[in-house]
């Protein structure tokens, strides 16, 4: 198990069944549910989409290392990220949830000021091994 897991705009539930996701999809300029689900189905092959290997939210979270999770508040995946953060809290799993306010899918990969702020936070986490 890695000591620290960094998740940037992750698909946490490959079924995309969270009804809140449809609301956020309308604001997400990059990620649509139907196209995403199609790609996830190709990637999954014979693995069911609700299997923890495809939908980590369905797996056993105990024993995971520290988790840093960032997701834009304007992306389709935001509702599941919030739900996942609550699940981690309920199980007392150390994590840091970094919402990218008014930002889009995989925002830390784009040359915008918020990217630099996230990378500075990430560097601090890696260097100090603190949340």
Pin down the residues of each PLM region.
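Alpha/beta-hydrolase superfamily serine-hydrolase fold, recognizing
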Residues: 1-131
